[in-house]
C-alpha cells in the first residue's frame, strides 16, 4: 500500500502515472495560506462550481495575511475552519483513488502526508421516476435510480428509525463497485446478517453490474428452478421487506434491489393488495395462482389429453382438434413446442430491439403466427390458442417468468413423450423443486409450512389489514416458532 508523501511533487507524479493520460483527470495547483497545494478531481464527477464556491473563495479571503506550513494548514482546514471537509482524511494512494472515483475532490498540501477530502459530487444520474416493470394503481410512484447514495436516501426517508442499518462497502471486482447491505437491527436475525455480510465480503465476482451478481455466492449449490430471492425497483416494497426482518442489497449503478430470503407466496403479492379490500385482494391472489399453474401445465395437459386420452374431450371439441391436426405436418407436441419457442423469440426480440421498432415486431409476429402459419398449414388454431393463453398468463406473475417458461417446455416434452406418466412426473418434479428450495434456512414455501393458518391470514387469501397489523410478521420469528412446534 503506497503511502502519501510529504512532497507535493511526488504525490502529483504518482497520480500522473495513474491518470495522466485520462481526459477527465483534473489537477489545479493553488496557494493556500501561503502553502503550495493542489486540488485533484475527475471532471464530470465532482462539481467545479461547488468547489470554487465552498473552498477557493473562502480561502482567498483568509489567506492574504496568514502564512502556514503544510501541516498547520492541514490542521486548520480540518479542525479550525468552516471549510466543508470530510472528517476522515486520506493517507494512502488507494484511499485517494477511491475518493476520486467516488466523485470527491481532494486537496494535497506541500509538507503534509494526508489529503483533505471535499464532498462536491456532481454526478449525473437518472431522475427518480416510476419503475416500468412494477405497475400499481395506488401507493408510491417512486422508483430506485442508478446511484447508490440516492437509493439509500430513498430508503432512509421511508424507514425513519434508528434501527435501519445501511452498510456500504466496495466489492472485490475490477471496477471496485460499491454496494450496500440494508437491514433493521431490531427485526433481522443478527446471525443471518453476519452470515450475509461475510458472504458479500468474500465474494469475488469479475464484474458487479447488478445485485443479482451476488446470488451464486448467497445461494451456492446445484442448479435450481426457483431462486429464493426477490427483486424490486420500488423503495416502498424494499421498506416493507425490511420491516419483515429481511435483508436488502443495493449495488451502485443498478436500480434493482435484491431482497432475501424471498418466499414463493410473495411472487403473487403487490402493493395494491393492501390498498384494496381483503375480499378483492384475495380474489386477485387466487387469480394469480390460477394463472401461474395455467401457464405451466395447460400446454402439457392439452397435449396429453389430445394425444393419449382423447375420450376425455367433448366430441365436438375432439372433432375440431382432429380436423385441425390432420392439416399440419408435425405431431401435436412438436407443434406446441414450436409455437412456444416462436413466442419466446418474439418476446426476446421485442425486449432487446429499439422501442421505435416495437410496433413492427408486433405486426410481423401477428401476421406470421396468427395468419400465415395457419394458412400454410404449419400450425393449427387450437395449438396457437392454447399457447397464446399461456403466454399472456405468465405476465400475471412476472417474478416467476423464468421457472414458468422452463417448466412449461419440460411439461410439454414429458407429456408428449410419456403421456399421463410424463405429466405426473412433471408435476411431482415441480413440487420437489419447490419443497427443496430454501434461502438462509428459510423454506421457499414459507410461511405455509409454519403453523399459522396461511389461508386465513396473508397467504393465498388475505385477512383485513387491521387484523394483520395486530399480529405483525417477522420471517425469523415465524421460523423459530415453526422449529419449536415441529
Task: Give the ranges of each region predicted by the language model.
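Membrane-embedded alpha-helical signal segments
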Residues: 1-297, 311, 315, 435-486
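Generic detector of multi-pass transmembrane helix bundles and their immediately adjacent loops
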Residues: 301, 314-486
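C-terminal TM-helix exit segments that contain a strictly Trp-centered aromatic cap at the helix terminus
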Residues: 215, 301-306
Amino acid at each position: 500500500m503506497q503511502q502519501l508523501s510529504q512532497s507535493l511533487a511526488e504525490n502529483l507524479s504518482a497520480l500522473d502515472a495513474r491518470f495522466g493520460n485520462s481526459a477527465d483527470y483534473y489537477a489545479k495547483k493553488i496557494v493556500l495560506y501561503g502553502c503550495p497545494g493542489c486540488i485533484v478531481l475527475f471532471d464530470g464527477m465532482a462539481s467545479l462550481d461547488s468547489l470554487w464556491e465552498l473552498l477557493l473563495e473562502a480561502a482567498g479571503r483568509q489567506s492574504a495575511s496568514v502564512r502556514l506550513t503544510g501541516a498547520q494548514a492541514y490542521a486548520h482546514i480540518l479542525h479550525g475552519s468552516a471549510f466543508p471537509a470530510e472528517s476522515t482524511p486520506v493517507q494512502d494512494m488507494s484511499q485517494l483513488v477511491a475518493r476520486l472515483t467516488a466523485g470527491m475532490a481532494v486537496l494535497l498540501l506541500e509538507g503534509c502526508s494526508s489529503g483533505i477530502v471535499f464532498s462536491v459530487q456532481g454526478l449525473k444520474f437518472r431522475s427518480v421516476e416510476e419503475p416500468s416493470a412494477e405497475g400499481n394503481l395506488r401507493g408510491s410512484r417512486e422508483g430506485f435510480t442508478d446511484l447508490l447514495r440516492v437509493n439509500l436516501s430513498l430508503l432512509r426517508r421511508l424507514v425513519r428509525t434508528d434501527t435501519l442499518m445501511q452498510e456500504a462497502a466496495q466489492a472485490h471486482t475490477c471496477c471496485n463497485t460499491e454496494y450496500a447491505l440494508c437491514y433493521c437491527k431490531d427485526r433481522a436475525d443478527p446471525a443471518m446478517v453476519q452470515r450475509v455480510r461475510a458472504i458479500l465480503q468474500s465474494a469475488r465476482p469479475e464484474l458487479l453490474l447488478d445485485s443479482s451478481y451476488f446470488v451464486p455466492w448467497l445461494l451456492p449449490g446445484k442448479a435450481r428452478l426457483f431462486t429464493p430471492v426477490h427483486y424490486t425497483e420500488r423503495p416502498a416494497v424494499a421498506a416493507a421487506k425490511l420491516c419483515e426482518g429481511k435483508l436488502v442489497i443495493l449495488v451502485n449503478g443498478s436500480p434493482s434491489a435484491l431482497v432475501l430470503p424471498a418466499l414463493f407466496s410473495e411472487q403473487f403479492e403487490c402493493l395494491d393488495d393492501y390498498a384494496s379490500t381483503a375480499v378483492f385482494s384475495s380474489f386477485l391472489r387466487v387469480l394469480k395462482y390460477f394463472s401461474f399453474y395455467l401457464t405451466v401445465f395447460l400446454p402439457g395437459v392439452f397435449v396429453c389429453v389430445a394425444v393419449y386420452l382423447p375420450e376425455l374431450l367433448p366430441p365436438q371439441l375432439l372433432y375440431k382438434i382432429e380436423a385441425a391436426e390432420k392439416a399440419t405436418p408435425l405431431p401435436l407436441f412438436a407443434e406446441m413446442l414450436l409455437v412456444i419457442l416462436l413466442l419466446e423469440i418474439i418476446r426476446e426480440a421485442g425486449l432487446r430491439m429499439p422501442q421505435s421498432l416495437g410496433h413492427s415486431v408486433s405486426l410481423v409476429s401477428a401476421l406470421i403466427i396468427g395468419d400465415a402459419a395457419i394458412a400454410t398449414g404449419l400450425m393449427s388454431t387450437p395449438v396457437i390458442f392454447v399457447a397464446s393463453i399461456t403466454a399472456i398468463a405468465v405476465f400475471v406473475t412476472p417474478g416467476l417468468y423464468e421457472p414458468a417458461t422452463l417448466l412449461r417446455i419440460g411439461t410439454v416434452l414429458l407429456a408428449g413423450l410419456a403421456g399421463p406418466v410424463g405429466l405426473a412426473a412433471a408435476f411431482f418434479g415441480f413440487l420437489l423443486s419447490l419443497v427443496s428450495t430454501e434461502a438462509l434456512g428459510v423454506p421457499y414455501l414459507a410461511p405455509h409450512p409454519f403453523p399459522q393458518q396461511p389461508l386465513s391470514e396473508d397467504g393465498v387469501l388475505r385477512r383485513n389489514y387491521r387484523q394483520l397489523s395486530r399480529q405483525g410478521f417477522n420471517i425469523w420469528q415465524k421460523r423459530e416458532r415453526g422449529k419449536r412446534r415441529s
